[in-house]
Amino acid sequence: MNFSRIIFLVFACFVALASVSAAPEPRWKIFKKIERVGQNVRDGIIKAGPAIQVLGTAKALGK
């Protein structure tokens, strides 16, 4: 009877340890938000590039 209790205890410990993840997900969400803001600024500059070029050309023609 004691042998079956020991086996059950070892099995329960194994299941408990197997269900715990060794490397939890990092909680660096603030850095992801900062990175996303940087990407939005970069994309905005890329999209505004042709418009700025047209304005520069128009200003040069106006002189």
UniProtKB/Swiss-Prot annotation:
Give the chief site where it resides: secreted
Cited Pfam families: Cecropin (PF00272)
For the keyword Protein biosynthesis, the answer is: no
Q: Which GO terms describe its biological process?
A: antibacterial humoral response; defense response to Gram-positive bacterium; innate immune response
Q: Which residues cross the membrane?
A: none
Excised during maturation, the propeptide residues are 23-26
Q: Which GO terms describe its cellular component?
A: extracellular region
The PTM Leucine amide maps to L61
Compartment list: Secreted
The UniProt keywords, alphabetically, are: Amidation, Antibiotic, Antimicrobial, Immunity, Innate immunity, Secreted, Signal
> Which residue positions does the secretion signal occupy?
1-22
Q: Which domain of life is it from?
A: Eukaryota
Q: What family does the Swiss-Prot or TrEMBL record give for this protein?
A: Belongs to the cecropin family.
Q: What does this protein do?
A: Has antibacterial activity.
Q: What is this protein called?
A: Hyphancin-3D
Taxonomic source organism: Hyphantria cunea
